[in-house]
Every structure is written in structure tokens, then in C-alpha cells.
Design a protein with these regions (language model features):
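Alpha-helical transmembrane segments of multi-pass small-molecule/ion transporters
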Residues: 1-320
């Protein structure tokens, strides 16, 4: 697949109008609500982590048919995650971050928006390609790894500043998403089509509400955030997620000898902005909330430019 200059411009405009604009509209609504009313951000956080996140994880896992050809993409997502964990840990130590900031900094790099940003983006980029369905299925593999890492590594990073290892593990085990992931995997082996039962529509309704609820909650959090435009760590985290992240992805893809459409999908997928969940986790565990919220906003805004470049480069670096 090759992308012309006109197509690149169209992709840029699409990202701006269909990904960036809707995201910021919902964030802005939450911001206005947070300024106008006295809202408890922790109540919203509890609703998201105990209802919406488990529903999203369950539906995505249950609906995804994992076949042999997807295992390489799954393996890539795990290896790339390990690379990001290693890089972000070393970078954080180099900057001599506190435990709290170090955890938030690491989450801002290794937790990326593979769901409500990455999935529609991959759908758009490959929609006119004969590999469209394959591309989306690969993205779902990445999404599964990110879902699991968010509810394990992400929670651990955010909680370790004020909790010991045992307490951090207890916090992780209290999150229902861990159990819904296990339940989804087990139910896939049972000769019962859950999508035909009366329970399924309710779960889907919750899954569909996850994105809007998360973004409005982020807006409420931002309304209570003191912005520090001189916060160097925000810009370093943004640089790491949007520029170093794709570079590390390219090296990983090259070393794993991945080519063609799969290489294009994985490079683009690994270049998306910091996940909203990074900010929500920070709110839930009261860990560097302002920093995390600012990184989500900054990376989301600037990704309209960086992603356009990555998409174009992917067609040059990995021919089909």
C-alpha cells in the first residue's frame, strides 16, 4: 500500500476532524461541567474502573477470534511493551524522578491509546485496502495487550509511590477488569454464544459508553488541574511517546523480521498518543494527576502531525 500526497493530506484532515476534534469536544464538555458544578472526580473514576473498563475489556476479548497468524502481532505487542518499560524506567532514573512522578512518567509512555484512537485510525488508513479486515484484527491484538498492561503494570506504577509491593498487588487484584479478562477467555471455550443472551446488550451498552465517559471525566479533572507550561517533564514525556516510541517500534519490527501490512499496522499503532487511562489511573490512585492529564492533552493534540508523518513513512519503509 502506498499513500499519495493527496491521501496524506486527507488522512491528516481526517485525524483532525474525526479523532482530535471529537475528543476535545468531550473533554471540553467535562471541563465546563467541572467549572460550573462541584463534582467529585473520584466518584467518576470509580464508575469507570469498576464498570466501564471491565465491560470494554470483556467485549473486546470475547469478540476477538485469535488465530495463529495473529500470534506474531501479539508477541510484538508484548515485546514492544517490555521495550517501553525498560526505556521509560531508565529515562526516569536518568531524570532522577520521584517515585510518584516516575510511575506517572512511565505510564505516559507505555500506555498508549490503542482503543478509541488507534482502532478507528487503523480502520481509516486501510479501509480501501484488500487487507482492511486483517489490519483491524492485528490492531485488536495490540489493544488486548494494552488492556491487560493498563490494569496491571499501569496500576502498579501509579500506586507504588505510596504503597509497598504487597499493597500495590492488592490494589491491582481489587480491579474487576482483571477478572473480566479471565472470564472472557474462559467463556470463549464454553459452547455457549453469550452474544445471544439477554446479558450481552447490557455489557455492550457499557462498552460503548466507555470512551465518552472517560473523556468527560478527563475534562472534569482538567478543570481542577493547575497547568504549568514550564513543566519540562510533560514535554519530555510527549517527546518520548510521539517520537521515541515510533523509533523503538521500528527497531522492534525490524528485529522481529516483520514486513508488509503487518509492519505498517504495528508501526502506526505504536505511534498513537498517551491513553486517557493513564490520566484516569493517576486520578484513581491520586498520583501526579496534573502531570498525567497534561501529557494526555499534549500528546493527543500533537499526534495529528506526528501520526501523519508516521503513516506516510510506514508506506515507504514497509512495501506491500
Amino acid at each position: 500500500m502506498t499513500v499519495s500526497v493527496e491521501a496524506t493530506v486527507n488522512i491528516f484532515l481526517y485525524i483532525l476532524m474525526n479523532n482530535i476534534a471529537p475528543v476535545f469536544i468531550l473533554i471540553f464538555l467535562g471541563f465546563i461541567l467541572g467549572k460550573k458544578f462541584k463534582l467529585d472526580i473520584y466518584s467518576f473514576s470509580k464508575i469507570i474502573f469498576f464498570i466501564y473498563v471491565p465491560a470494554l475489556a470483556f467485549v473486546k476479548l470475547y469478540e476477538t477470534k485469535i488465530e495463529a497468524e495473529h500470534l506474531k502481532a501479539l508477541l510484538y505487542a508484548v515485546i514492544y511493551l517490555a521495550v517501553l518499560v525498560t526505556f521509560s524506567t531508565l529515562f526516569s532514573r536518568l531524570r532522577k524522578h520521584s517515585t510518584a512522578l516516575g510511575g506517572a512518567f512511565q505510564n505516559s509512555i507505555l500506555l498508549y491509546n490503542s482503543a478509541n484512537f488507534g482502532l478507528p485510525l487503523i480502520t481509516l488508513v486501510f479501509k480501501d485496502s484488500p487487507y482492511a479486515a486483517f489490519a483491524v484484527s492485528l490492531q485488536i491484538m495490540v489493544l488486548l495487550v494494552q488492556n491487560i498492561s493498563t490494569n496491571t503494570i499501569g496500576l502498579f506504577n501509579a500506586g507504588r509511590s505510596r504503597l509497598n509491593i504487597g499493597e500495590s498487588l492488592k490494589t491491582i487484584l481489587k480491579m474487576p477488569a482483571i477478572y473480566t479478562i479471565a472470564a472472557a477467555l474462559l467463556l470463549k471455550c464454553v459452547p455457549l454464544d453469550l452474544t445471544k443472551t439477554f446479558v450481552w446488550p447490557a455489557i455492550v451498552y457499557l462498552k460503548d459508553g466507555m470512551v465518552s465517559m472517560a473523556l468527560v471525566t478527563l475534562g472534569i479533572q482538567l478543570s481542577k488541574t493547575k497547568f504549568e507550561f514550564k513543566h519540562v517533564e510533560v514535554y519530555l514525556a510527549t517527546f518520548a511517546r510521539l517520537l521515541i516510541g515510533p523509533a523503538l517500534a521500528f527497531v522492534t519490527i525490524y528485529l522481529m523480521n516483520i514486513h508488509g501490512i503487518m509492519a505498517q499496522v504495528l508501526l502506526i499503532s505504536s505511534s498513537v498518543p498517551t491513553a486517557v487511562n493513564a490520566a484516569l489511573i493517576a486520578v484513581e490512585l491520586d498520583n501526579e494527576k496534573d502531570f498525567s492529564s497534561q501529557v494526555v492533552m499534549t500528546t493527543t493534540l500533537l499526534s495529528a502531525v506526528t501520526l501523519t508523518v508516521v503513516i506516510y513513512l510506514s508506506t515507504i519503509l514497509f512495501k506491500v
